[in-house]
Amino acid sequence: TDVSVSAFALKVLRATRDPDVLQLGVAVPHSSLLPTRVLNGILARIARRDAGRGVSYDFPPGSPELRRQIARRALDAGCTLSPDDIVTTSGCQEALSLCLRAVTRPGDTVAIESPAFYGTLQTIEQMGLKAIEIPTCPRKGVSIEALKLALDRWKIKACLIVPNFSNPTGALMSDDNKRRLVQLCESRKVPLIEDDIYGELQHAGQRPLPAKA
């Protein structure tokens, strides 16, 4: 029996509710590793200060205050952004979906890392796109040489890459390989969609730069 990516993803997500299952299928740390009490205190203070804000809508492109803070934080990652450059979404999957919708049509081909996060495969399947899997090394990240060969062979409309701590390999691309990735996509006029969701997870020292930097 054929099993769709969406059906498989739903099965994995259902298992996340089982306390006896070690969650390796989703990128969610155990609650004991998070400063939950501190975060709850901050949320409570904000709710008391602006009680109506938490029960009202924020319309696109998102809260002006939040977008200003994101733009400021982006400076730490080597990116100069204006709040007007930023659109907030309800999660990473929505952001990736919006990016793909902006540069592809059903039937188009997208280059992705292999192995890839199942949610990415689910989004590509739901949008009627095709995926070309590019080999990824756990130490060096996506193979630039393999991506070049794929671009030579297929009409690829976008590249979706996670340069910093890719899921599920945890691979971190070097700054040199990030530059090569950007230069390759620019030379082929292929949009590069960078997913930097894990860029802040550096255990020590400065966070790695995104490819955009």
What would you call each of these model-derived segments?
Residues 1-44, 68:
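N-terminal basic, amphipathic alpha-helical segments
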Residues 43-188, 193, 199-213:
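Conserved core of the PLP fold type I
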